[in-house]
């Protein structure tokens, strides 16, 4: 179930402050954040946000198609190594 429209999208206040500061100075460095739960807003388009995945910060370049999604969706936390081949059962 989605979030109520009357509440609006959730974005951490410190992330909004960082985005506004970068927009004012037109700095090209990635914005480092641990806030995977924040929703991507139209103001983020064209910025690179380094999202923490539990081990390191993954750079995410925000495009138009990402608006409305959460930052955590683009920084995977698990690596799939693949299933082992396994031995076939002997008859």
Swiss-Prot record:
Ribonucleoprotein among keywords:
yes
Known InterPro entries for this protein? Answer: Ribosomal_uS19 (IPR002222), Ribosomal_uS19_bac-type (IPR005732), Ribosomal_uS19_CS (IPR020934), Ribosomal_uS19_SF (IPR023575)
Q: Where is the signal peptide?
A: none
Q: Which GO terms describe its cellular component?
A: cytoplasm; small ribosomal subunit
Gene3D superfamilies named in the record: 30s Ribosomal Protein S19, Chain A
Q: Which GO terms describe its molecular function?
A: rRNA binding; structural constituent of ribosome
Keywords, sorted A to Z: Ribonucleoprotein, Ribosomal protein, RNA-binding, rRNA-binding
- Is Ribosomal protein among this UniProt entry's keywords? yes
The UniProt entry's GO biological process terms, in alphabetical order, are:
ribosomal small subunit assembly; translation
Which protein family is named in the record? Belongs to the universal ribosomal protein uS19 family.
- What role is this protein assigned? Protein S19 forms a complex with S13 that binds strongly to the 16S ribosomal RNA.
Q: Which NCBIfam families does this entry report, sorted A to Z?
A: rpsS_bact (TIGR01050)
Q: Name it.
A: Small ribosomal subunit protein uS19
What organism, scientifically named, is this protein from?
Dechloromonas aromatica (strain RCB)
What's the gene?
Answer: rpsS
